[in-house]
């Protein structure tokens, strides 16, 4: 989604915003904590979007909601300690479907934790999950087109759902 967000910014503010994808595929919040200094803090960002819920919910990673919250709070605290003016945005994503849901049966609790932390810390939340649920329930074929592997939104889904919602949440 970072590439599609960059394209959306470029379309509105050419050359004024740089989106850096500091994440890595298949990683979860424990990895985020371990790599935060090098991959995020060292870049001195103005804004950081954090979204590890869907991978924290992955059963083989054995990351409880409590540990995921502790990791999330740690990342927030460390980012703000290094740059108090950094805007931190929390984000939920799409529901996993098919085999991916079976591997993440408690995904709702992880997304709710993100909502709770955003509210408690007064952080902006981009809650994509309800939008994705509406798409899934109203037009499964469209959902499948937007999320072709059942877990990762493809470029079209990112361009049509994720990037516009982030821009809207930012008031842009």
Where is each model-derived feature located?
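Alpha-helical cap/lid subdomain in secreted, periplasmic
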Residues: 3-18, 31-172
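Short beta->alpha junction loops
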Residues: 21-28
């Amino acid at each position: 989604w970072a590439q599609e967000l960059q394209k959306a910014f470029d379309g509105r503010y050419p050359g004024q915003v740089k989106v850096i994808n500091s994440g890595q595929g298949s990683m979860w919040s424990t990895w985020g904590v371990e790599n935060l200094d090098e991959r995020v803090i060292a870049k001195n960002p103005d804004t950081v979007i954090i979204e590890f819920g869907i991978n924290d919910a992955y059963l083989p990673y054995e990351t409880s909601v409590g540990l995921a919250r502790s990791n999330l709070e740690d990342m927030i605290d460390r980012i703000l300690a290094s740059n108090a003016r950094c805007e931190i945005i929390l984000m939920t994503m799409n529901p996993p479907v098919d085999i991916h849901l079976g591997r993440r049966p408690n995904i709702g609790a992880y997304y709710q934790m993100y909502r709770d932390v955003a509210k408690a810390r007064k952080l902006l939340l981009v809650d994509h999950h309800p939008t994705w649920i509406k798409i899934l329930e109203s037009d499964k074929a469209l959902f499948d087109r937007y999320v072709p592997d059942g877990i990762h939104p493809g470029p079209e889904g990112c361009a049509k759902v994720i990037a516009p919602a982030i821009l809207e949440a930012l008031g842009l």
